[in-house]
UniProtKB/Swiss-Prot annotation:
Reactions catalysed according to its record: a (2S)-2-methylacyl-CoA = a (2R)-2-methylacyl-CoA; (2S)-2-methyltetradecanoyl-CoA = (2R)-2-methyltetradecanoyl-CoA; (2R)-pristanoyl-CoA = (2S)-pristanoyl-CoA; (25S)-3-oxocholest-4-en-26-oyl-CoA = (25R)-3-oxocholest-4-en-26-oyl-CoA
Residues reported to bind substrate: 38, 59-62, 83-85, 91, 125-130
Known role: Catalyzes the epimerization of (2R)- and (2S)-methylacyl-coenzyme A (CoA) thioesters. Accepts as substrates a wide range of alpha-methylacyl-CoAs, including (2R)-2-methylmyristoyl-CoA and (2S)-2-methylmyristoyl-CoA, (2R)-pristanoyl-CoA and (2S)-pristanoyl-CoA, and the cholesterol esters (25R)-3-oxo-cholest-4-en-26-oyl-CoA and (25S)-3-oxo-cholest-4-en-26-oyl-CoA. Can also catalyze the interconversion of the non-physiologic substrates (2R)-ibuprofenoyl-CoA and (2S)-ibuprofenoyl-CoA, which are potential competitive inhibitors of the enzyme.
Protein name per its UniProtKB record: Alpha-methylacyl-CoA racemase
GO biological process terms on file: acyl-CoA metabolic process; lipid metabolic process
């Protein structure tokens, strides 16, 4: 694969969620990713688009032969990604110490929800659980309603795979000077906590409260929210700065002199009611056209099925069509070492073929 990580060798122990997502991004950026799957888990691989840009092999890691083959592969790798509960790879004979014996330059990347240590480290959980303990889930939703799960973007991917990737790349950079590998302990509860650092800082200065839906960036401010249009669809409004707010009012045909002051919190309900009435007067596409070339920070809220028709998305080739559906292209983009369009998930190959290739 073309890309800035061309030549990097990655072994991925089969898992779900953020580990495979991190491996996918490494593959998108040119790394040679080999996924070791269980022999009984290969059904449905062609339907999992997250397994793009991989070579897939199978091995029974509980057998002596499977363990031996896996260690041979790891001995030639730069990075190992695993997402099991703490202690599982050690019991398999593939823990950090065992792998370091065959490859002391290996970056051993561990992805868990709770981390390798702590009282919850052996406890099951999902994205919603990890972000429930660090304040994030409590902060998302309307003030008069229960907290709303933000899909599984914040814990699994924002706080999980993204920070796993940061750890891998940082450890690879450090290896250039030390010549040694190390363990990367990436926990979703830790990474997602860093994502919300801005809110902690605002809270420390009195600019954020624990009351959900009452703050500037959580839908509390009427100029940072979504509004329903005449056709039942929605627009997103992010008109925070005065000049953007003024542009929004101009597009709506409203006079600031006749409205409550933008940042008078006591009159936010009144301002919200006026904006709600204005946006409800026309359909979403009308407002999309009105604000298409303005700095009002007003955009249509598109469903998945509409995204690939958005002119900006089309112009940037943000998505490509594959197997009857749409998939995102690799990101970010590089001026000299551009990534190519991803390969679809491949059929399994013999692990010996990869070993021979990596011997070259």
């Amino acid at each position: 694969m073309a890309g800035p990580l061309s030549g990097l060798r990655v072994v991925e122990l089969a898992g779900i969620g953020p580990g495979p997502h991190a491996a996918m991004i490494l593959g998108d950026l040119g790394a040679d990713v080999v996924r070791i799957d269980r022999p009984s888990s290969v059904d449905g691989i062609s339907r999992d688009a997250m397994l793009r840009n991989r070579r897939i092999v199978t091995a029974d890691l509980k057998s002596d032969q499977g363990l031996e083959l896996a260690l041979k592969l790891i001995a030639k790798a730069d990075v190992l990604i695993e997402g099991y509960r703490p202690g599982v790879t050690e019991r398999l004979g593939l823990g950090p110490e065992e792998c370091a014996k065959v490859n002391d330059r290996l970056i051993y990347a561990r992805m868990t929800g709770w981390g390798q240590t702590g009282p919850r480290s052996q406890q099951a959980g999902h994205d919603i659980n990890y972000i429930s303990l660090n304040g994030i889930l409590h902060a998302i939703g309307r003030g008069d309603e229960r907290p709303v799960p933000p899909l599984n973007l914040v814990g699994d991917f924002g706080g999980g795979s993204m920070f796993l990737l940061v750890g891998i790349l940082a450890a690879l950079w450090e290896r250039q000077s030390s010549g040694k590998g190390q363990v990367v302990d990436a926990a979703m509860v830790d990474g997602s906590s860093v994502l919300i650092q801005m809110m902690w800082a605002m809270r420390a200065t009195g600019m954020w409260t624990d009351t959900r839906g009452a703050n500037m960036l959580d839908g509390g401010a009427p100029y940072y929210d979504t509004y329903e249009c005449a056709d039942g669809r929605y627009v997103a409004v992010g008109a925070i700065e005065p000049q953007f707010y003024a542009a929004m009012l101009a597009g709506l045909g409203l006079d600031a002199a006749e409205l409550p002051p933008q940042n008078d919190r006591a009159r936010w309900p009144e301002l919200r009611a006026l904006l709600t009435e204005a946006f409800a007067s026309h359909d979403r596409d009308h407002w999309g056209a009105v604000f298409a070339n303005s700095d009002a920070c007003v955009t249509p809220v598109l469903a998945f099925g509409e995204v690939h028709n958005e002119p900006h998305i089309i112009e940037r080739n943000t998505f490509y069509e594959a197997n009857g559906g749409w998939q995102p292209m690799p990101a970010p983009r590089f001026s000299r070492t551009a990534s190519s369009q991803p390969r679809p998930p491949a059929a399994t190959i013999d692990i010996e073929a990869v070993l021979t290739d990596w011997d070259g």
